[in-house]
Regions:
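Generic helix N-cap/helix-start motif at coil->alpha-helix transitions
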Residues: 2-4, 41
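Non-catalytic C-terminal accessory modules of carbohydrate-active enzymes
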Residues: 9-147, 151, 157-183
Length: 183
């Protein structure tokens, strides 16, 4: 059969290699009740990822173990940490998206270490991978040591290439984070 759990691994690797469009194509192949896997054939609930799909004649496309799988967790990680690029880091959230080229915008809200982060990622040039230029609460994140104002840069120099680090504020507030993918 087709083991779906590993699909999440492939999505993450596609994103690590800068292939956001491929990552989305892979995710769509195993989405519940999608064109490739209609619930009428698979027998799975239309809102639940399955562990695997059968390739045996007579059972082709039937799903197994839809409620006992890590597939949903790994695919969520592929979407959230891979495509949207929102990753936990020791110093805060690192946001380095790998978008499907067709995506112009995506947003998410993340609770992290005592604060909420409303994150909007914009991709007007339809890049799969670009340099994230980040603002937090209206202030541009620039290079410098991690705790300089207000964000750090993995390269720690004075360029505008924000290495994607948004600090962990831990203040109980909601912070507005805007990410612009640039060349």
């Amino acid at each position: 059969g087709v083991y779906c759990h590993a699909t999440g691994f492939k999505i993450l690797m596609d994103c690590k290699c800068g292939r956001g469009t491929k990552a989305l194509e892979t995710l769509k192949k195993i989405m519940p009740d999608s064109g490739k896997n209609p619930s009428s054939r698979s027998g799975a609930e239309p809102y639940v990822f399955t562990n695997c799909y059968s390739t045996n004649p007579g059972y082709y496309g039937k799903s197994y173990q839809s409620w006992t799988t890590g597939t949903s967790a790994w695919c969520m990680m592929g979407l959230y940490e891979g495509m949207m690029g929102i990753k936990r880091d020791y110093d805060g959230l690192r946001i380095v998206p790998c978008f499907p080229a067709a995506w112009e915008e995506a947003e998410a809200t993340r609770h992290f270490r005592g604060a909420d982060y409303h994150i909007v990622i914009r991709n007007p040039k339809h890049l799969e991978k670009g340099k994230p230029v980040i603002t937090v609460d209206g202030s541009l994140c620039v290079g410098g040591p991690v705790n300089s104002s207000p964000c750090g840069d993995e390269r720690r120099d004075d360029s505008l290439y924000a290495g994607g680090l948004v600090p962990a504020f831990g203040d109980g507030k909601t912070h507005e984070v805007e990410v612009l993918l640039s060349e």
